[in-house]
Amino acid sequence: MLIGPLKREIDILTSDECRKLMKACSQKAPTGIRNQALIVVLWRSCLRIQEAIDLSPKDVSSDSIRVHSGKGERARTVGLDPESSAVVERWARLRQELGFKPSQRLFCTLKGEPLETSYCRHLLKRLAKKAGIEKRVHPHGLRHSGAVHLLDEGHNVVVISQQLGHSNLATTNTYLNHLKPADVVAAMQT
């Protein structure tokens, strides 16, 4: 019997590590402000990288994001907390000041071209190094981290599943099953 390749365990970032990642972005350069917004959308809204880079400005409101190109072509609306909304709004205002057209993607280069997934992966790796984060940081890891943080904050698994765009709760449970053996042992000691 053939066994497929082992899946690499996803490193879950703490909320503090996610914030460090955002702080590693330039606080003044347009690309830094854009990158902060991209990180917060991947992390707090739990979007897939392609869903995030496919967003247009009209897809984002003060409390939600409308995803049109979800996996399996299923559209959905996800929530956006006030703190994250402020970060995204800052980028939305700046991109308007820079003269970007509403028809251009929300997350684009300074020339108005859509971001590439490979660029985003490289960007997160570079920012993680700058922030002193030793864990493997990548777009899907931010999505997983966001889901775990939502659970830690007391959100219902059904709500988290809808945020993630999963059609099956079992898929969501694999995202949330990130307990380390030491955590399980410690829980049994109380």
What are these regions (language model features)?
Residues 1-190:
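Conserved catalytic core of the tyrosine transesterase superfamily
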